[in-house]
Regions:
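Alpha/beta-hydrolase fold catalytic core
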Residues: 1-35, 56-59, 97-98, 279, ...
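Conserved acidic catalytic loop of the alpha/beta-hydrolase fold
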Residues: 83-100
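Flexible "cap/lid" loop of the alpha/beta hydrolase fold
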Residues: 113, 117-118, 122-161
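Conserved alpha/beta-hydrolase catalytic His-Asp/Glu region
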Residues: 135-138, 142-146, 158-221
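Catalytic active-site module of serine/aspartate enzymes centered on a nucleophile-bearing elbow/loop
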Residues: 254-285
């Protein structure tokens, strides 16, 4: 069980059985709650271009840092999706949230789907999967458009041998830096690197193992709430064919929005278009 403790301007969820573990979150606004679950290897700060828009729409907006990232404590283990979904469940329970909306970006889509699998949808109104890893990243015989095992092995090897250098190149691919007419700045790359490089090395590696290897295809039947799927057709990290399109085919009630020319980090490069898409999804009953 997690208990809420608050430092000045810094709310945390603290586990009763492990006082050394604290999950950091930020909670603003009122109204129906939206929880924003960030991607790998960043933190809740990655939603900064979406939070003001959602607040202006009248929602209560909650971001949190996955364990080992941002201001949340690292642990030795517990980075599989059952444990990560448990952290989300505790956040919802301890904050006494009802009729929740869940937005998962990239790796964060896994927490959303596993939450629905393990805890059901009774307390969930709708969800959004943005540049999500759902349902499967890894290439297999029945998933030919996935990322090859060799590429995934290369990522894990680089994380173990030269993590900070790998993260620099990763975020260029994250935004298709140098390939888009709508580029992000070098400062944005530096900002992301500063967040990612400060994450726990253990958490970074173990979370990569989780998103690279978890097959959510059998769990798509558990997604029984209204769903928005947003994916860029030029995503170099999680290709649309292995993720967005398959998710749209496997989830019963969904709106599938393809961002033309969108990279993985379309929450930054195409923030205005994404925010318009989220607004339409939230306001159309």
């Amino acid at each position: 069980m997690l208990n809420i403790t608050k430092n000045i301007n810094m709310p945390y969820l603290t586990k009763q059985d492990n006082k050394n573990f604290e999950l950091y979150y930020e909670d603003f606004g009122s109204g129906q709650p939206i929880i924003l679950i960030h991607g790998w290897p960043l933190s809740g700060k990655s939603w900064e271009l979406q939070v003001p828009v959602l607040l202006d729409l009248g929602y209560r907006v909650i971001t949190y840092d996955r364990k080992g990232f941002g201001k949340s404590s690292p642990t030795l283990d517990g980075y599989d999706y059952d444990n990560l979904a448990s952290d989300l469940h505790e956040l919802i329970t301890q904050l006494e949230l009802k009729n929740v909306i869940l937005f998962g970006f990239s790796m964060g889509g896994g927490e959303v789907v596993r939450y629905l699998t393990n805890y059901g949808s009774e307390n969930v109104d709708k969800i959004a999967l943005i540049s999500s890893i759902i349902p499967l990243v890894k290439q297999k015989d029945d998933n030919p458009h996935g990322v090859s095992e060799e590429e995934l092995y290369g990522i894990l090897t680089s994380l173990k041998t030269d993590r900070v250098t790998f993260l620099e190149s990763f975020h260029k691919n994250f935004y298709n830096y140098g390939l888009l007419s709508q580029k992000v700045s070098q400062k944005q790359l530096d900002y992301d690197w500063s967040i990612a490089s400060c994450a726990s090395p253990i958490a970074t590696i173990k979370c990569a193992e989780s998103w690279a290897n978890t097959d959510f295809r059998p769990e798509l039947v558990n997604v029984n709430v209204k769903t928005l799927i947003v994916h860029g057709d030029d995503d170099q990290i999680v290709p649309i064919e292995t993720a967005g399109r398959q998710a749209a085919e496997g989830i019963a009630d969904n709106d599938f929005v393809i961002i033309e020319g969108g990279p993985h980090g379309l929450n930054v490069t195409h923030a205005e278009l994404l925010n318009e898409t989220l607004t339409k999804f939230l306001t159309n009953n």
